Design a protein with these regions (language model features):
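Thiol/disulfide oxidoreductase modules built on the thioredoxin-like
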Residues: 45-53, 58-104
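Non-globular targeting/processing and membrane-anchoring segments
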Residues: 108-111
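Conserved protein kinase catalytic core
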Residues: 8, 42, 86
Length: 111
């Protein structure tokens, strides 16, 4: 789950990696979920522009609060199949780092 904004340069820099990860692991049950608070019309345009192939939900105070009141963006949580947060990253994180956590989780049918 990636908390981001269209005006955030590090957020924008991460998106191609998320697109690649979504494409690579979708058939194993993996989904990137973006969370943005700018509103559907802004986000839809941005998603088309960057070729985002994963869902983006509109954030609200409850969603942000559920994840510990996000204080910086991008902030990304890797969540396992049970819904447990495995790890969190604040600031730009590269695709290889995300994959190093995601790939083993997908191999483990319990996690």
């Amino acid at each position: 789950m990636d908390f981001w904004a269209t005006w955030c340069p590090p957020c924008r820099a991460e998106i191609p990696g998320f697109v690649a990860i979504q494409k690579k692991y979708a058939d194993k049950g993996f989904t990137v979920v973006g969370v943005d608070k700018q509103g559907p019309s802004v986000v839809r345009h941005f998603m088309r522009e960057l070729g985002m192939n994963y869902p983006v939900v509109m954030g609200n105070p409850k969603i942000v609060g559920d994840y510990g009141f996000i204080t910086a963006i991008p902030t990304t949580f890797v969540i396992d199949r049970r819904g447990d947060v495995v790890t969190a990253y604040e600031g730009f994180t590269d695709q290889a780092t995300f994959e190093s956590v995601i790939a083993p989780l997908l191999e483990n049918t319990q996690g």
